[in-house]
Amino acid sequence: MTNTRKSHPLIKIVNHSFIDLPAPSNISAWWNFGSLLGVCLGLQILTGLFLAMHYTADTTTAFSSVAHICRDVNYGWLIRYLHANGASMFFIFLYFHIGRGIYYGSYTFMDTWNIGVLLLFAVMATAFMGYVLPWGQMSFWGATVITNLLSAIPYIGPTLVEWIWGGFSVDKATLTRFFAFHFILPFIITAMVMIHLLFLHETGSNNPSGMNSDSDKIPFHPYYTIKDILGALFMMIMLMSLVMFTPDLLGDPDNYTPANPLNTPPHIKPEWYFLFAYAILRSIPNKLGGVLALASSILILTLFPIIHLSKQRSMSFRPFSQCLMWLLVANLLILTWIGGQPVEHPFIIIGQLASVTYFFTILILMPSTALMEDKLLKW
């Protein structure tokens, strides 16, 4: 008789995805982030569900309902801070996951890569709308500034913004719809994750060498299940340390002031994980240009499979490309720092230089360096 694990119509799907899945024998800790993102998504949905039980999506009571969750609900403070800091962990892992994909050439799996870019957009949209819900000063003004960017779209822009707002400013209608979208999007993300995995399992995982590993595969369980559990344990230690000791470290103090349309905060800025894109947006002194640069900074990821000119897939054996990769990481850290600074000298020029360097590195330096390395190897 066949093992139920291999014959049951539902269980065999799980079996082929997480148990008997042939995996490369040499994948490093950089391959842990996919499963960690799955853990983060599960945690966010779970904590979000409990928060939604006590939250009210109304401009008059939203701020008070969050205060009520923290003060009066059993372990409400824990659920709220797990959710807020869980989002930060989510983005840290997302950026590591994407960075790993760029370094090891995983973007050559085009279907998996492109659905991944769509996932990034969906997660960013969800996080942005979630930040609006506590209805603090930064929630309100962040929503106003970012939604207002759409007015730069020619002809339909102003109408589109009013349509999204549900009125002539960010108000009750905006908050209600943002809550509705913030609730539904994680489930859409979960479905997209399944498609992401479906495409991945069509090809199998990449590995640090960038070469075909069909001749050297091991079963996912127990090797990578135990490795993923260890990764999740480290993640929980980091997250719980953050939540228990410095829960507001990554937040903005302005968000502890209830939203006031008559009083603008001195520095409007998004959460830390959007600062690099915000810096690129601000570095162009033109509304439409800034919006296009902002969109391009993420959409540029879809070009990686096209601008990959090296005959090697991975950067493991390409020292010059490695230098450029770390230059890009440093550049993104500079952009993140600039995004949180006021718009004044010298931050303006630093932001503009870093923005130019970002696009120049990806579009010009990386492909030309790849060609140079092939030449040096006489390929």
Curated annotation (Swiss-Prot):
Membrane topology: Multi-pass membrane protein
Annotated Gene Ontology cellular component terms: mitochondrial inner membrane; respiratory chain complex III
GO MF term (any one): ubiquinol-cytochrome-c reductase activity
One of the GO biological process terms: mitochondrial electron transport, ubiquinol to cytochrome c
Keywords, comma-separated and alphabetical: Electron transport, Heme, Iron, Membrane, Metal-binding, Mitochondrion, Mitochondrion inner membrane, Respiratory chain, Transmembrane, Transmembrane helix, Transport, Ubiquinone
Leftover remarks: Heme 1 (or BL or b562) is low-potential and absorbs at about 562 nm, and heme 2 (or BH or b566) is high-potential and absorbs at about 566 nm.
Function: Component of the ubiquinol-cytochrome c reductase complex (complex III or cytochrome b-c1 complex) that is part of the mitochondrial respiratory chain. The b-c1 complex mediates electron transfer from ubiquinol to cytochrome c. Contributes to the generation of a proton gradient across the mitochondrial membrane that is then used for ATP synthesis.
Official protein name in the record: Cytochrome b
Lineage, highest ranks first: Eukaryota, Metazoa, Chordata, Craniata, Vertebrata
